[in-house]
Amino acid sequence: MALNHQRRTDKWWETEYSDNIHSYLQYHEVKWRMVYGARSPQIHLRPVLVKTIRSIAKTCEMSNVCVHLAVTLMDFFMDNHDLKFDTIMLVSFACLTLAAKIEEHCLKIPKLNTMQNVISKDVTNSHFRKVEMKILMFFEFNVAVPTVAHFIEFYKDHFFCDSDFYHNEFASILKDKFNRMILSYQDASLESIKLISYNPSMVAASIILTTRHTLGLVPCWTPQLRKVTGYLKKDLVQCCSLLGRNVMQHRKFVPIDEGYLSSSPGFQSPIIMASKKKRSHIDVPNIILSKRTAF
C-alpha cells in the first residue's frame, strides 16, 4: 500500500535516504578519483572549452550538475591524451552528451548539428559515436561520478542556522545573496585547474564555508555543517584560499556573468604522478584506443 504522506521528489538530497546517499557519494569520489597532473598540451584551451560547454548547456536548459560532470570528464580525458585542435572541441562536446545522458531528460541531450559551427562539417554521427565510445572505454564505462555540484545541493540545505536570522526582515535579502554567491563560487571552482585535485565534496564544503565567511555569518563553520560534511574548518583552509584567490582574479579580469578565467598552463598540481605515462594521440579520421593511466 502506498504511503501518501511521503514526499515524492527527484532531488535525492530531499529524501529520507539523503545521508546514506551522501556517504556513498563520498566513498565513490575517493574510489573513482584519478590523479590530475595538469599536463595536457592543450590546457591553454580549457577556458574556451568550459565556456562552450556552459553555453550549449544553457541553450539546452541543462542543469549545473550536468555541466560539472561534463567538465570533469573532459579534464581527466584531456590530461591523458594529445588532441588535435579540430578534435578537442569534438571531445568536449562528447563529454557533454555523455553527462547529459546520465543527468538529464533525453529531450535535453544536444545533437551534433549544434556544434557544426565549431567542428569539422565532415564529422558524422558514426564518427561522433566512436569518440564517445573512446571516452567511455578510457573511464572503463564508469562516468557517473560525483561532482562539486552534486554535493553543493545537499550542503545548501544545511547552510543556515537559527542564529543567522536574528533580524527576520533581513532573512529574504540574506537568502538571495546566498543563492547568487553560491552560484558565483561554483562557477569559479569550475574554471580553476588548481581545484581539480581536491575531492569534490571538499571543494563544495569550501564553497559553503567561503560563502558564510563572505556574508559575515558567525560562526562561519557551524557544528551542523561539520557533522554533515565530515570536514573540520581547518581541513578546508587551503581549498578556501585557492577558491578565494581564483574569485578575485575572476572579478578582476572577467565580468561575473560572462564565463571563464584563463588559468596558467604552467601550473603543476600539488599531486603529481610519480611516473608519467606516454599519452596516446587521437585524430579525427583515426581513433586509437588508449590505456587508462595507472595511479
Question: Over which residues does each language-model region extend?
Answer:
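Acidic, serine/threonine-rich low-complexity regulatory regions at protein termini
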Residues: M1-F295
